[in-house]
Amino acid sequence: MAAQVPTEALKELNVAEGSQKPGATAQSKTDAAGDEHGGDDSEDEADGHVDGAAPTGEATKKKKKRKPKKKKKHPTSQTDPPRVMISQLFPNKAYPKGEEVEYKDENNYRTTNEEKRHLDNLNSDFLADFREAAEIHRQVRQWTQKTVKPGQTLTEIAEGIENSVRALTGHDGLTEGDAMKAGMGFPCGLSLNHCAAHYTPNAGNKMVLQQEDVMKVDFGVHVNGRIVDSAFTMAFEPKYDNLLQAVKDATNAGIREAGIDARVGEIGGVIQEVMESFEVEIDGTTYPVKSIRNLTGHNILPYSIHGTKAVPIVKSNDQTKMEEGDVFAIETFGSTGNGYVRDDMETSHYAKRGDSQHVDLRLSSAKNLLNVINKNFGTLPFCRRYLDRLGSDKYLLGLNSLVNSGIVEAYPPLCDKKGSYTAQFEHTILIRPTVKEVVSRGDDY
């Protein structure tokens, strides 16, 4: 989920020379495996008869052997659409690791250092939660890439992804507090064409995916508040291939540079250099691919998708360092437009602010809605469809009151100029003591 650079911070960005173009402005977890009580039903087969008495026909008959109980079999593959809980496919919680990358230069010793390896081993629950969330993300997105086609409504696509995530976590989010144990880390974003981020359909939305569209699919999965944030772009016409390749390569460049003691401003410079080495020809016109300079990656905290650190996607003087134990979403956005986004269209994404102060709310609808948010989402982002799903109604006045009071943050869609095309790719990386782990890496990207 994209983080936006505050407007005043843009003035501090030292954008690499030559990158500006004319006109340009970033649980109850259900162990479905269960206890399997196999039936080792031992039986004493008695031929018993009374001494001195002639054995009768009945007494000489052996007892019937009882058939042993059949052991429950664990599912071995995912369904279509995905509905098998991931814990059933991995009953021992041995979830796949992400891509492990050794640190470079002065941090290379960490890979074999015994003390660092010990620290890594202490993080078993932390790693298991992230790897479970990542495997759910991989299975759901690979199903999405296979099944989503032009002609589907955005609502159908978003709900298909979200319902699959809930099924694989085993938490449908309909009972109080259930969505905070595991489920959606934030709403499924489906941003089309010039819209780069934070768009998901509200109730009644009739928008249909078209053959010529470029769609950013950005969704999060959390387990115990540990959020995996990963995104990809879908296009159905080969003319957009270079745009998608530019952004994918830029994201991978950022991942390569990330690590302990890496400075985020320098990472941004590498991302920009790779991104802006591409151009794309669309319908006979050639466009330079630009990094969207007021969007950034970000670190991730428990139950908080946007932490306190940002990873720019253009060169800057930001000297903030990545540190051991950090979790980062490395995401990049490329555009054929201005390389700058503004708020546009109807807002759908919201999140309760972690730093919000107590406010005396006068509207009863605002008080009631805040109670729903606290019990079902906490500081996890939500959208209006999620409130509808919980049975909330006539909440818009209360929601606006919470936003105006500074309790809830609104995240409107972020768009470049109309007629342009934008693309996004994103991975979550764990800055472990011994290696960095691209936990959301898959065969697809």
Swiss-Prot record:
Sequence positions that bind a divalent metal cation 1: 218, 229, 426
Record's subcellular location: Cytoplasm
Catalytic activity field: Release of N-terminal amino acids, preferentially methionine, from peptides and arylamides
Hydrolase recorded as keyword: yes
Biased composition (Basic residues): 61-75
Listed Pfam families: Peptidase_M24 (PF00557)
Cofactor binding: number and manner: Binds 2 divalent metal cations per subunit. Has a high-affinity and a low affinity metal-binding site. The true nature of the physiological cofactor is under debate. The enzyme is active with cobalt, zinc, manganese or divalent iron ions. Most likely, methionine aminopeptidases function as mononuclear Fe(2+)-metalloproteases under physiological conditions, and the catalytically relevant metal-binding site has been assigned to the histidine-containing high-affinity site.
EC category name: hydrolase
InterPro entries: Creatinase/aminopeptidase-like, Met_Aminopeptidase_Type2, Pept_M24, Pept_M24_MAP, Pept_M24A_MAP2, Pept_M24A_MAP2_BS, WH-like_DNA-bd_sf, WH_DNA-bd_sf
Binding site for substrate: 198, 306
Identification of the protein by name: Methionine aminopeptidase 2-1
Organism: Fusarium vanettenii (strain ATCC MYA-4622 / CBS 123669 / FGSC 9596 / NRRL 45880 / 77-13-4)
Organism placement in taxonomy: Eukaryota, Fungi, Dikarya, Ascomycota, Pezizomycotina
